């Protein structure tokens, strides 16, 4: 029996033979072209073909997994036609006289590196999307057709990595689970696996060997363990676990409409993290109490030009209206004006406050909270609040309606903000702890580096102590505090977070009901005494 440990990103237990996905790859030839116009038209033809294919995939995804999954491919369509992406390819073909294949390949690497270098995990995961879109264009240019699964029986599908388009195109009746050497929980493939209810493990690295193909295995998407040639006891234990998970899922459906209250009467708000207006449907279906993190990045990713104030306003208005009075917290994007990022190639804003204007205009249509990211000092908060007041004065002068009850908050995602939270709490209405970045910066550990995965541990006492400190400082100053990172859905820490006194946990929509179940099974009177002992215990990296 061989056990390989990765990261579980989609719960469930899959049992069956291992099968290695064989990807048809396009061979990139490089040569100088003389007729650059003809080469450009060749690229444009492949681009058009890719957009049409992605449209078909979006419809397939909508039929199989719903609107949230379809949105992934609609985003890919926009990426394929992105003006900056297209101009970079055109420059290579027209000015550098590259052939189309080389131009697309080099541009893909450039944009993938751009996304991978960003601080936000969601944005980092978009590097894989750029590569996927580019690979589709390259396949058309090179005449390559992707294969499927050459197996007569359902399998545990193993691969170095899987692009979202590969994931959705595969015959789901033949897939018992996904196992990849690379990848992350923020990747679109992981999101698709969760949406489709397929167990998935990522980050197993080079422990996944081709010679294991055909051998019986069990993939536990909850723990991230892949067991090859399991003994009878292990097999029986994991099969029993699968039956229990299926029973639990049926139970969870009965929790819709029930309160998030512990056995000793403490209430916690369970909100959702979303990335676009289309995700609101998933919040409603899973009975989320509100939106604790709405990433405004989608407006920039899904547009080839800088989004206008009206475009931003309409998007925010749609979400607030659809949530029908439930709280919506929108995180601002911290680029523009004098903080230009060269590789985005964004024009200098004539009105750097237009994003804030859009937010306050939208506030008239629901219960809005505005959240500023990556804050480390009181000065930054005061400057942000000053901008908010200026925007409100302008709107009032122009006779444009807005709400006076907009809460202003900040993300606590750096050690500096956590340590300084006693002072920051005096300036805002709420804190939202971004545990992904807080863990990374506290432990000085790149969470995207698989080799360091053992040391990127959100359960580290230093991280938990900072969360406890932030919670205490928030409550001392009369403001509420929540978590909007992946850790909020970690059921192993639900009891700890409730004992700390966190007021809100914001998670992916599919995590709402499992988290509600965990909350209702918790008695914080029993766990509070144990909390400090656990934080004081000797630590060993997992």
Task: Name these PLM-found stretches.
Residues 1-322, 328-335, 358, 362, ...:
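Non-catalytic, soluble scaffold/interaction modules
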Residues 249-542:
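Conserved alpha/beta-domain cores
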